[in-house]
Amino acid sequence: MLTILKTGQSAHKVPPEKVQATYGRYRIQALLSVFLGYLAYYIVRNNFTLSTPYLKEQLDLSATQIGLLSSCMLIAYGISKGVMSSLADKASPKVFMACGLVLCAIVNVGLGFSSAFWIFAALVVFNGLFQGMGVGPSFITIANWFPRRERGRVGAFWNISHNVGGGIVAPIVGAAFAILGSEHWQSASYIVPACVAVIFALIVLVLGKGSPRKEGLPSLEQMMPEEKVVLKTKNTAKAPENMSAWQIFCTYVLRNKNAWYISLVDVFVYMVRFGMISWLPIYLLTVKHFSKEQMSVAFLFFEWAAIPSTLLAGWLSDKLFKGRRMPLAMICMALIFVCLIGYWKSESLLMVTIFAAIVGCLIYVPQFLASVQTMEIVPSFAVGSAVGLRGFMSYIFGASLGTSLFGVMVDKLGWYGGFYLLMGGIVCCILFCYLSHRGALELERQRQNALHNQDSLQLADAQ
């Protein structure tokens, strides 16, 4: 890995009397840095969607070519989440995230000066690859600075960064068009968002923090022994800091059944989510005979209902469920099953919109809770690798099932075939939520036993 991305040497130790105050200040800065950084990734990702009408008009690209460009980015992003998140385990989170933003900005500048389809395709693939550098550092930072009892709320706050980022792309690009004019559509669509992303990258470098130990503070496990993840693994003679990213992935993720359970939870969540997002507009227009305006309202409710529900879910999983994430995820998926039937069978505009909003409100909750659980089933130094497996599985398999396989089912069996596919996915998701919950309870028991044994040894030494 490039030297500039590595974690670097530990800072001078913070005096004991200043540890609590410094810790509190640094963790807020760390959270803000990954919130703003991940938000910025969406500015240089979703701007491509806003540029597609001009790709068709100005560059004479066909709908098939534009669809191929979108697919290239999706596939590249899915692969990148797997690889880049694993590499992030061995890097400085703030430098890794900022570097990815700058690389995305450079690619967008290239898009601003390109006109050939194949150059566009290559740059879009590179953008997808560099986009994967954002999520790993985010989860690593949260795992390093926040205990399990707070991760539901903290993770929920971070999770809405993509809603905020996706929401401010249009105003940024719109303002650029107003100032530059439509004749400079490439500058407005790509170069201006790239400049904004570079500014955010600088903010990440200034605000961001490494692990507590790298900032001269005790680690989270030292300050709160109950945070230590106890795993039964083989061939772990090497210290984690002396292991490569691949060795960490193989030892702590690939052989970890809980990492696979939570990844499969995400696969089926993404299947339902992408099945709804990709096919909701055409289903409402062709089957329910909605107008375009009515369809847009239903789609708007589906997307924006996620923000309050995510924040509430974070609070509930911390407070009501005491840090156990999967029971709430199972409840949400069961409710989605019922609402999906209502959405499918209802004829009323109001009822279809309500059911679509409820599904949108709930579908992001299991996805978010799976991301929080990922931080709790592996040691902090392997979080990026676990996030990488989950990201790869969800995009390459989950999104494909919800888009391509749904389309095949509709062509072969009609719309009811597509809905049966989604309902089957919900049942599978609930099954893996249950298995993941059992695994989390097992880890919790191991943690408590380890703490009990440690207390017994300390008591024996004292005597």
UniProtKB/Swiss-Prot annotation:
Inducing factors: By extracellular phosphoglycerate.
Membrane topology: Multi-pass membrane protein
Entry-linked Pfam families: MFS_1 (PF07690)
Keywords: Cell inner membrane, Cell membrane, Membrane, Transmembrane, Transmembrane helix, Transport
InterPro entries in alphabetical order: MFS, MFS_dom, MFS_trans_sf, OPA_Antiporter, Sugar-P_transporter_CS, Sugar_P_transporter
Single Gene Ontology MF annotation: glucose 6-phosphate:phosphate antiporter activity
Localization of this protein: Cell inner membrane
Domain of life: Bacteria
Ranges facing Cytoplasmic side: 1-29
NCBIfam families membership: 2A0104, PhglyTportPgtP
Functional summary from the UniProt entry: The phosphoglycerate transporter protein is a part of the PGT transport system. It is the membrane bound transporter for phosphoglycerate into salmonella.
Protein name (record): Phosphoglycerate transporter protein
